[in-house]
């Protein structure tokens, strides 16, 4: 599946019907999604501010709007279609340094030649000359009629996948506001998606957000091939990105799947501390269940064989649910 057919199906399967109101969504994002070790980090500059327990999250880090406070960045600007439910969809929202967020404004994202960059942003600093050290850690901006913003290298893929998500889920209102905005960015953000693949932090953030949005994830984080098939026409390059994520997921869950990747027949190794019943639920990247079966496993190590040879190549989400405790483990399987 590719092109408009894929885009339509992704919208049907992943567009959230449950969205928090804007006040609640900011507090939730700061406190529940992005706070790490009691601090928040700006998506663009890496600047961090403390966020202790017992405070109003949004107000505490805002610092009354000072340049080095933190507020909410809409990667798809509010003035260009991020209104209504889209305004509060956390899959395209991030904490940002107030001044950097303001400078980015409604400018499109894109690569900027160093010689043309007017402002370089790093942590709580700004400069007008090309940095001599750690240049990739800086975001860059151009103002004026031809304004543009380039995020730091380590988050370019995150930004790209947020933009593809927004344009897929809210295309009508995005195009109504400015039919050229996405097209201006498309070539660069396709490349960013390939150059900066999903890492564990982005994967886990996606899962956290889904918890507050009716279980709806950003599918472009789940399956790296979707952006290729829907927008970028470079599937071979894109699809190598998630292999390490798949392996890491398996190692951390007491759930081992092998061989993975594979051709459709694979095995689940389960270690049970007592006799127990499990359900294995396998979904494709459109959220459709393609396999659902219960298993009674014995105390000790168990091996279960699964066959999905009749299904298309791509990523599949495998959920293993302990019926007695209602605890689930989940991982990805890549079928060649």
Residues covered by each model-derived region:
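N-terminal module-boundary/linker segments of secreted carbohydrate-active enzymes
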Residues: 1-48
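Domain-level detector of nuclease and nuclease-like folds
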Residues: 60-71, 76-242
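Residue-level detector of functionally pivotal "anchor" positions at catalytic/ligand-binding pockets or at interdomain
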Residues: 234-258, 273
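Short coil/turn motif common to extracellular beta-sandwich-like domains
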Residues: 261-267
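A glycine-anchored, Pro-Gly-centered beta-turn/N-cap motif
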Residues: 264, 276, 300, 312-315
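Short, glycine-anchored, charge-dense loop/turn motifs used at functional sites
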Residues: 283-290, 316
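Solvent-exposed serine/threonine-rich low-complexity stretches and specific carbohydrate-binding patches
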Residues: 291-298
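C-terminal tail/sorting-segment detector
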Residues: 297, 305, 309, 313-336
């Amino acid at each position: 599946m590719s092109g408009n057919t894929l885009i339509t199906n992704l919208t049907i399967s992943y567009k959230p019907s449950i969205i928090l109101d804007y006040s609640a969504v900011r507090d939730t994002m700061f406190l529940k999604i992005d706070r790490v070790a009691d601090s928040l980090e700006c998506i663009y500059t890496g600047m961090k501010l403390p966020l202790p327990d017992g405070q109003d999250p949004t107000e505490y880090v805002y610092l009354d709007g000072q340049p080095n406070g933190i507020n909410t960045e809409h990667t798809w600007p509010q003035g260009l279609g991020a209104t209504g439910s889209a305004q509060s969809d956390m899959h395209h929202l991030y904490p940002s340094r107030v001044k950097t967020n303001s400078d980015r404004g409604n400018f499109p994202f894109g690569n900027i030649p160093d010689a043309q960059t007017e402002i370089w942003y790093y942590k709580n600093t700004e400069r007008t000359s090309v940095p001599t050290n750690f240049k990739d850690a800086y975001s860059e901006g151009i103002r004026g009629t031809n304004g543009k913003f380039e995020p730091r290298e380590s988050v370019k893929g995150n930004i790209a996948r947020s933009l593809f998500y927004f344009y897929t889920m809210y295309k009508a209102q995005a195009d109504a506001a400015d039919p050229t905005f996405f097209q201006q960015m498309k070539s660069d953000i396709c490349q960013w998606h390939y150059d900066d693949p999903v890492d564990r932090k982005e994967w886990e953030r996606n899962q956290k957000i889904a918890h507050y949005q009716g279980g709806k994830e950003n599918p472009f984080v789940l399956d790296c091939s979707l952006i290729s098939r829907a927008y970028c026409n470079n599937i071979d390059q894109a699809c190598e990105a998630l292999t390490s994520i798949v392996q890491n997921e398996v190692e951390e869950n007491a759930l081992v799947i092998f061989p993975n990747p594979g051709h459709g027949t694979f095995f689940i190794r389960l270690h049970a501390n007592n006799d127990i019943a499990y359900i294995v639920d396998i979904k494709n990247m459109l959220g459709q269940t393609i396999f659902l079966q219960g298993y009674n496993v014995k105390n000790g190590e168990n091996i279960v064989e699964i066959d999905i040879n009749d299904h298309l190549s791509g990523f599949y989400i495998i959920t293993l649910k302990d019926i007695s405790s209602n605890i689930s483990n989940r991982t990805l399987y890549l079928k060649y």
